[in-house]
A protein has these predicted regions:
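Compact, glycine/acidic-enriched structural inserts
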Residues: 55-73, 110-149, 315-326
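A contiguous strand-loop segment
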Residues: 24-118, 151, 329-330, 335
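Positively charged n-region of N-terminal signal peptides that target proteins for export
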Residues: 1-5
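Bacterial N-terminal signal peptides
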Residues: 8-19
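Aromatic- and glycine-enriched pocket-lining scaffold segments that form the walls
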Residues: 137, 141-178
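Structural recognition of the beta-strand scaffold that forms the well-ordered cores
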Residues: 39-41, 100-103, 167-169, 177, ...
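C-terminus-biased signal that marks the final domain/tail of proteins
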Residues: 23-39, 152-154, 161-162, 171, ...
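A short, structured loop/turn motif at beta-sheet edges
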Residues: 95-97, 131-139, 244-251, 286-288
């Protein structure tokens, strides 16, 4: 094919090897608009209902990275609103400083080394650890780049392996991608890292995207549900939609990109059994501190305005229940009710 004439050998090999790789879903994209308009969108693609609920966590919560043994302990500096999967861990969320955490599937993740004696941090609380402790990406990278702890990753309640990687953008538009490969933490930091999907590892995703950048999104874009194709489409569209400081248009633009990379409900692919339907989408307006949520099963989008929430130390944990068929529309900040915090899943 003519297009392959421009493709280096390594990228060509990636196209061939990833075309038959089973995929777990999820896509994340960061919109970098004018006047500090930073908006992050993500899809949650999973093969079953994750029984997701939203939680408001105040400042001053005492946390541990595991139930016992050598682990991390901290008291949360920042409050956050998070989406909990199965009520056992934080999969997505934003803290009161506009730092967002998006946890996505990555088959290639290997967290431990032989005879690893580093302190343990459960993968269920990994994203929450970042939201609790840091206001910016730079702060988080400075604290984590020493690779001083290892991730504990027990299987999910449905038996799926909890192999994940973490993306964090802040309100300035800076981003970082954290991956554990062969027991070593790999970090990519910079405003250019707007997109994250799933397999292969991030350095290989960038190689594939570089190839498609040469072709140009107006000429041709890959259209399957594979992670590498979703990466390319999100990379093109997040910068092709209207670039504006108007929050309503910016949020609408990000939602449109997230829908473009979503997997239709009920889709199954016989030769790629791990492709999963999109269950929900979130969009975080990091400038105005508004967290938007859209369930595939709901006719409405709702949002949570942080200015209407109480994150003060000593305030109760609050929960917005989504698992009972509840339908919300508009600003749901007032619908959160006091509730006990869920128990994070540890080994």
């Amino acid at each position: 094919m003519k297009t392959f004439a421009y493709l280096g050998a390594s990228a060509a090999a990636l196209l061939l090897t990833t075309s038959h790789t089973p995929i777990q879903g999820c896509t994340r994209a960061v919109y970098l608009g004018p006047d500090g308009m930073v908006v992050t969108g993500r899809t949650m693609d999973w093969r079953e209902d994750l029984r997701t609920n939203l939680y408001l966590f105040p400042r001053g919560m005492e946390r541990s990275g595991a139930d016992s043994g050598k682990t991390l302990h901290w008291i949360s500096k920042y409050g956050s609103v998070i989406a909990a999967g199965y009520d056992i861990g934080t999969s997505d969320g934003m803290n009161e400083k506009g730092l967002v955490a998006n946890l996505l599937y990555l088959t290639e993740s290997v967290y431990t080394r032989p005879d690893d004696t580093r302190p343990v941090l459960g993968i269920s609380i990994w994203a929450q650890y970042v939201l609790d402790n840091f206001a910016t990406v730079r702060e988080a990278v400075a604290a984590l780049e020493g690779d001083t702890f290892r991730i504990d990753a027990p299987d999910m309640p449905n038996g799926a392996r909890s192999t994940m990687h973490l993306a964090i953008p802040d309100s300035t538009g800076n981003s970082a991608i954290f991956e554990y490969l062969d027991g070593k933490l790999i970090i990519h930091e910079g405003r250019q890292y707007q997109i994250m999907t799933n397999s292969p590892s991030y350095d290989r995703q960038i190689t594939l995207d570089d190839y498609w950048q040469q072709i140009g999104g107006l000429v041709m874009l890959p259209g399957t549900n594979r992670a590498s194709d979703r990466f390319v489409r999100a990379s093109f569209y997040i910068n092709a939609v209207t670039q504006t400081s108007d929050p309503h248009l910016a949020v609408a633009g990000v939602f449109s990109v997230m829908r473009n990379v979503s997997v239709p409900l009920g889709i199954t692919t016989p030769d790629q059994p791990n492709i999963a339907s999109t269950r929900w989408r979130t969009v975080s307006d990091q400038k105005n501190r508004i967290y938007y949520f859209e369930s595939t099963l709901s006719p409405d989008i709702f949002w949570v305005s942080f200015d209407k929430l109480d994150f003060s130390a000593g305030a109760p944990v609050r929960k917005l229940t989504l698992t009972g068929g509840e339908i919300y529309a508009g600003d749901a900040a007032g619908e959160f009710a006091p509730a006990p915090p869920f128990k994070f899943l540890f080994e």
